[in-house]
Regions:
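Phosphate/Mg2+-binding loops and adjacent switch elements
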Residues: 1-77, 84-89
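Alpha-helix N-cap/loop-to-helix initiation residues
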Residues: 57-58, 82, 132, 209
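Class I S-adenosyl-L-methionine
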Residues: 56-57, 78, 83, 87-98, ...
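Structural motif
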Residues: 54, 80, 204-206
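P-loop NTP-binding site
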Residues: 95-251
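Acidic-enriched, low-complexity/disordered segments with a strong bias for Aspartate over Glutamate
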Residues: 9, 19, 25, 30-34, ...
């Protein structure tokens, strides 16, 4: 909390996070129209847009095509890796001058539902006990790469893929937002080999949930060692059901 601030000063400002490379891709004229529609609506409903991975773009310009992300919005560059901009972002959403909920959206809920129905959301957790002890990095890296390969071969576009491994010797997380993209890796990369690994996989992809699940299950069976405690769900988001429509404020 900022010096001199009290609990009564705190407010909540809706914010959206935007991956710069993924955002630039969705803003191209040849991008998938449904995915671009969802992206634009998510930006529009936010009072503050947070552009992530600032550490990859020292000049804060981002990849080509990024500029429209912040058009019409308050925007901040953030880096979860270095902490750049995080304190300023927290101060802004809690104590800043931006009016919370100041935007009224005109949403085509039928199109929104169609766009979300094109996505498969997969959540997977399991325990891996390899035949020989191995480090978390050597579990996460090959598994994420293998998932990328089989999803690409199945012509399933990745929107977001994250693999997290927790072991007694340390943890590692790797994630990316497109097929073939270099993953962002965090954690204890030099952790010692471990005999037991608890893994989480979060996947958002464009495709039929049953097909996405089949592909991921197939790769799960390829892991060497004993796999147990599998919890897997894969589904398309249900259609939004707004409780009420708020009339647009008079100018």
């Amino acid at each position: 909390m900022s010096e001199g601030a009290t609990m009564s000063d705190i407010k909540a400002v809706p914010a959206a996070g935007a991956d710069p490379a993924r955002g630039a891709e969705l803003l191209r004229e040849d991008s998938d129209s449904d995915m671009a529609f969802l992206f634009q609506k998510q930006l529009q409903e936010a009072d503050l847009v947070c552009v992530t991975k600032a550490d990859l773009y020292p000049e804060a310009d981002g990849p080509p095509g990024l500029t429209p992300i912040s058009s019409g919005h308050a925007a901040r560059w953030l880096s979860a890796k270095t902490g750049q901009g995080v304190q300023e972002w927290l101060d802004e959403i809690l104590f800043g001058a931006i009016e919370a909920g100041g935007t009224t959206l005109d949403i085509d809920y039928a199109r929104y539902a169609r766009a979300e129905a094109a996505l498969a959301w997969l959540n997977l957790s399991f325990v891996l006990e390899p035949a020989l002890a191995v480090s978390p990095a050597l579990v996460v890296g090959p598994f994420l790469d293998a998932l990328d390969v089989v999803l690409t071969e199945a012509e399933i576009p990745i929107v977001h893929l994250k693999v997290f491994d927790n072991s007694a010797c340390g943890w590692v997380k790797a994630a990316h937002c497109a097929n073939g993209e270099e993953p962002r890796v965090e954690g204890d990369l030099d952790a010692s080999p471990a005999e037991r690994h608890e893994l989480l996989v979060n996947l958002r992809a464009r495709g039929d949930p049953a097909n996405v699940q089949r592909v991921v299950e197939g790769q799960l069976r390829q892991l060497g060692g004993r796999v147990s405690d599998i919890r897997l769900e894969c589904f398309s988001p249900s259609a939004p059901k707004p409780e009420r429509r708020v009339p647009r404020a008079a100018a």
